[in-house]
Regions:
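Histidine-centered catalytic micro-motifs
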Residues: 207-213, 240-250
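N-terminal secretory signal peptides and thylakoid transit peptides that target proteins
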Residues: 1-20
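Alpha/beta-hydrolase fold active-site loops
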Residues: 37, 82, 150, 158, ...
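N-terminal active-site segment of His-dependent metallophosphoesterases
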Residues: 27-98
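Extended active-site neighborhood of metal-dependent phosphoesterases/phosphodiesterases
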Residues: 31-33, 55, 59, 95-200, ...
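Short acidic, glycine-rich surface-loop motifs adjacent to enzyme active sites
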Residues: 199-217
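Short, solvent-exposed loop/turn segments at secondary-structure junctions
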Residues: 49, 93-94, 214-217, 222
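Active-site glycine-centered loops adjacent to acidic/histidine catalytic or metal-binding residues
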Residues: 44, 88-89, 123-124, 210, ...
């Protein structure tokens, strides 16, 4: 199939109440269990004018990410999702800051083709390429999130929280010449802010980050303060999902009823058949349904 893998077609169709033959699926949602919000998500495009890495290492097809992102945006436009979000490492760092900025402007143009709100999460490669202030100035988050690296927004009773783990444990911000992919950490100010957002949230909460927040990210793939964060999420009783990137091969864990979904990297592998992105549906009960496209895994969980 052109826009998604065959293994995901039936699940995707059923998510919208139709089978491949156009008939109602047996497990389609009841009228009172329609999604309250749907969004598209991708991560780790690592776009840049750089040659692909080759085996035995992971193949990162840097230049191809513009075409892969175009497919993602076209698909989400056709699905009419409420918004889209990228989970970091939008660009691959280049020795030349000017070339890194040119890459960011190019991939942002593709991202901005979406007919609705768009949001960004900062990754370690973004910060290695471009200072935080310049990155947020050259990208366009929707609404009050514009010009911010960490922020929250609400859509149809669901609160979404975007975290910026681009700090060292001593509070020093990461940036060009001072990044470490194994040492992601929130700033002190963000912890105070996070407590306030969770306290104010009146419904379900979904968290976006670049670093993983579950305990299974080996070798620095999980944020250093993830244990503390999971306790905060559990105590709030409001968080139903955490979406992250950073670990290019993806993963999923359910801890205390919270789904920790790590999306596979868009840049991994050559050709559109090696693309990776997903559509997420959130239901009134807190059920979360992830419909994976191409290499992305499909998952469903309930709190």
């Amino acid at each position: 199939m052109d826009m998604m893998t065959r293994r995901n077609f039936t699940l995707t169709a059923c998510a919208f109440g139709l089978s491949a033959a156009g008939t109602l699926c047996a497990d389609s949602a009841a009228p009172d269990e329609r999604p309250v919000v749907r969004f598209g998500v991708m991560t780790d495009s690592h776009f840049g004018d750089l040659d692909s890495t080759r085996p035995p290492h992971e193949v990162r097809a840097f230049r191809e990410s513009a075409r892969k992102l175009r497919e993602f945006v076209d698909t989400m436009n056709s699905r009419k999702v409420d918004f889209i979000v990228e989970l970091g490492d939008f660009v691959e760092h280049h020795p030349s800051k000017e070339k890194s900025l040119a890459s960011l402007e190019r991939i942002e143009r593709e991202f901005s083709r979406f007919n609705g709100p768009r949001y960004h999460v900062l990754g370690n490669h973004d910060l290695q390429a471009i200072p935080r202030e310049e990155f947020v100035r050259h990208t366009a988050n929707a609404g009050e999130a514009k010009g911010r690296a960490h922020y929250s927004f609400e859509k149809n009773t669901v609160t979404f929280i975007v975290l910026d783990h681009g700090y060292f444990a001593d509070g020093v911000p990461m940036g060009p010449g001072r990044t470490d992919w194994t040492k992601g950490h929130l700033s002190v100010e963000q912890w105070r802010w996070l407590d306030g957002v969770l306290a104010a949230a009146k419904g379900k909460v979904i968290v976006f980050s670049h670093w993983r927040l579950d305990p299974m990210g080996h070798g620095g793939l999980t944020a250093l303060d993830a244990d503390r964060m999971r306790e905060v999420f559990k105590k709030s009783g409001k968080v139903v999902a955490s979406f992250s990137g950073h670990h290019h091969y993806g993963d999923y864990m359910n801890i205390d009823g919270i789904g920790y979904y790590c999306l596979k990297a868009m840049c991994t592998g050559s050709g559109t058949e090696n693309n990776s992105y997903a559509e997420v549906s959130v239901y009134p009960s807190g059920k979360v349904q992830v419909t994976g496209f191409r290499r992305a895994e499909s998952k469903i969980w309930t709190p």
